[in-house]
Amino acid sequence: MPFLGQDWRSPGWSWIKTEDGWKRCDPCSHEIRSEDNQYPVNHSIILNSGEEEIFNNDCEYAAKKRKKQHFGNDTAAHSFYREKWIYVHKESTKERHGYCTLGEAFNRLDFSSAIQDIRRFTYVVKLLQLIAKSQLTSLSGVAQKNYFNILDKIVQKVLDDHQNPRLIKDLLQDLSSTLCILVRGVGKSVLVGNINIWICRLETVLNWQEKLQNLQMTKQVNTGLTLSDLPLHMLNNILYRFSDGWDIVTLGQVTPTLYMLSEDRRLWKRLCQYHFAEKQFCRHLILSEKGHIEWKLMYFTLQKYYPTKEQYGDTLHFCRHCSILFWKDSGHPCTAADPDSCFTPVSPEHFIDLFKF
């Protein structure tokens, strides 16, 4: 049974119910006793009185040291698990001092395990890309270390499963550009850590880029159904579900049939209408020699000037009632009468803006 101590911020003590009433549980005392009782030895048989006193003192010191190590391991085990949400406060209060930083949120929201979820992968990569472009130097030393550890896991994941390599190449390109500017302009901005650390990071990113550049897609030996075996209307349906033009171009390079379907004007027209407004079409109208609108060229031209709509399988959410940022699947301890009405999806750009003070 947990009991709240004098300090309201403490985790409290653990109590167990016995025949004599409630007693405070000491987890390490049972472990130490069990270790001492495993090999009972009568030390008085082999030691005299003077040596026995020295032996007892050594045993007492060893027991205290073992007890201290046990408490240290227990504390580390408790701190290892953290809630996957964070309270976003922008000013000091009576209970909370300071404010929540981008680095603190980055450390607390468990992005390391989020990259293993295919629904969150694109979201996390986009967030890392935005941080690489403008917020890298605002992270604390611990957050920067966590950032590059997560990036290392992402690169290894792509090298292993061969999924989303183009997405990671774009991220590493932006990151290497930022690191080059920081290293060349040393002294112009405040860098956390020694300059040699940043040079080492740049070399690591360049090494990642080289590995991804040399990535060879292994041909899978599969006797089952393939894309070529599907009817045309199903292949067309697959293409219409893509929201990224580069994915359509890449898929069109697989077979001549898919290339023919990927060049369909109606497909690119629908993609342009999904991402861009009609006013934007008029400003960058591209016509063919026959007077038809080149929707494919229009898409890639408009992409240079305007942001495209982004779709994510799962995103972070912000609770307006509790001011808590959290993953929707993990939830958070909400006290609102109707929690769902207080939740707002947080885009990667909005996530960055939350911590601009």
Swiss-Prot record:
CDD domains in the cross-refs: F-box_FBXO25
Keyword Nucleus: yes
GO terms classed as biological process: protein ubiquitination
InterPro entries (UniProt xref): F-box-like_dom_sf (IPR036047), FBX25/32 (IPR040394)
Positions of the F-box domain: 224-271
Main location: nucleus
Keywords: Nucleus, Ubl conjugation pathway
Coiled-coil stretches noted in the UniProt entry, renumbered to this chain: none
Region ranges (Interaction with beta-actin): 1-83
GO cellular component: cytoplasm; nucleus; SCF ubiquitin ligase complex
Subcellular locations according to the entry: Nucleus
Involved pathway(s): Protein modification; protein ubiquitination
Entry keyword annotation includes Glycoprotein: no
Domain notes: The F-box is necessary for the interaction with SKP1.
Purpose: Substrate-recognition component of the SCF (SKP1-CUL1-F-box protein)-type E3 ubiquitin ligase complex. May play a role in accumulation of expanded polyglutamine (polyQ) protein huntingtin (HTT).
PANTHER family to which the protein is assigned, alphabetical: F-BOX ONLY PROTEIN 25 (PTHR13123:SF8), LD30288P (PTHR13123)
Quaternary state and interactors: Part of a SCF (SKP1-cullin-F-box) protein ligase complex consisting of FBXO25, SKP1, CUL1 and RBX1. Interacts directly with SKP1 and CUL1. Interacts (via C-terminus) with actin (via N-terminus).
Protein name: F-box only protein 25
Origin species: Rattus norvegicus (Rat)
